[in-house]
Amino acid sequence: MTAPRTLYDKIWDDHVVHQSEDGTCLLYIDRHLVHEVTSPQAFEGLRMTGRKVRAPEKTIAVPDHNVPTTEGRDTKIDNEESRIQVEALDKNARDFGINYYPVSDIRQGIVHIVGPEQGWTLPGMTVVCGDSHTATHGAFGALAHGIGTSEVEHVLATQTLIQKKSKNMKVEITGSLRPGVTAKDITLSVIGLTGTAGGTGYVIEYCGQAIRELSMEGRMTVCNMAIEGGARAGLIAPDEKTFAYVMGRPHAPKGAAWEAALAYWKTLFTDEGAQFDKVVTIRGEDIAPVVTWGTSPEDVLPITATVPAPEDFTGGKVEAARRSLEYMGLTPGQKLTDIKIDTVFIGSCTNGRIEDLRAAAEILKGKKVAPGMRAMVVPGSGLVRAQAEEEGLAQIFIDAGFEWRLAGCSMCLAMNPDQLSPGERCASTSNRNFEGRQGRNGRTHLVSPGMAAAAAITGHLTDVRDLMTAPAEPA
């Protein structure tokens, strides 16, 4: 009888092609997602060595990082480097015969939104991409993580990857979340507790009642930021919600293949008695709407808190806090709700899905953004955009004073025209608040979609619960 195994153990074991004496393994890769920034050198490497893509049917490409989110982008991209990278992906996709969603295709969008949306991401798979937020796909019970450009070439050529196994970490969120608290608050709160190095060397399995109660889109948000917590990947065991989400998607199994897949997927859970190397437990009811105040995702506090002082920290974090406060232009003791906001960005692979847009629109309905506020919504894919327009969400955003954009990574990172100006302060639903992440000397506060919408209305960081519609009193 085999020893109890974790979900990570099971997926890993199912994909080991060969294991060396030192523990290094050759892993088979089921899905390879590709975008325009980390792939050009990899494809050129194939050309130079006369190789083909080993499994073009398992390789999916989409431009997202560099593409503008304004009309006319399918005919002209002004930035030369961005244009060259997008054109290179277009040519490489044609030359090597891989699946491709060009800018002109309504299915185009952020690669980590397109993959699940199209049914490419399935439970039990290994999924890689030259992008750190590949962990998103772990929401399906897939082992998904980012790889470097040389590894991109290796996977293109061999459909395998050389890896050493990580350790197992469990993050359990018990109980239920309170109203106004979201998946984004969960993942930021975990990072705030463990730090950005807390998951280093581990693959995290997220579990507990609060995780089970999340939708698939919420689970993707949680797993998306596993990398910000230092982990190699994040996983959530698949369940009936997972199967319902996947069923009927363009590239999901059909007929007898679906039944066979479903039988396998139902074995993908951590066995009773399986051992984790590290365990973190948080009570769901203790999580509040949160916001980052500094320049690291671990600099996170409940919106009801005040800006900390360097003296509140120890060791090397004292100087780090001092630098963060200086860069962010904040004063210790200042209420987080007193911090003025210039710009609001709703989008990214963390929070650019239809449920994220619904949550923001619910807060914005019938309201206007604060005077002078720059606010934009960037759907995560063309299909999300179309659905939001069909549901009337787009009109709510437009009526409130938001810009309604085309799909792309947009202001999550300063690699396209959507950027902050020096000193500009943004409430953002993205995943990183590093110095210059959204533009040189730009200041980023990470929040949930509802919190971003609240800040857009009031002009400052705001507790979304103060703007939520109170439930009707029972008769």
Swiss-Prot record:
Record-linked Gene3D superfamilies: Aconitase, domain 3 (3.30.499.10)
SUPFAM superfamilies: Aconitase iron-sulfur domain
E.C. number: 4.2.1.33
GO MF entry, a single one: metal ion binding
Biological process (GO), any one: L-leucine biosynthetic process
Pfam family, one: Aconitase
Cofactor section: [4Fe-4S] cluster
Catalytic reaction equation(s): (2R,3S)-3-isopropylmalate = (2S)-2-isopropylmalate
Binding sites annotated in the UniProt record for [4Fe-4S] cluster: 349, 409, 412
Family per record: Belongs to the aconitase/IPM isomerase family. LeuC type 1 subfamily.
Function according to Swiss-Prot or TrEMBL: Catalyzes the isomerization between 2-isopropylmalate and 3-isopropylmalate, via the formation of 2-isopropylmaleate.
PANTHER family: 3-ISOPROPYLMALATE DEHYDRATASE, HOMOACONITASE, MITOCHONDRIAL-RELATED
Protein name listed in UniProt: 3-isopropylmalate dehydratase large subunit
Source organism (scientific name): Cereibacter sphaeroides (strain KD131 / KCTC 12085) (Rhodobacter sphaeroides)
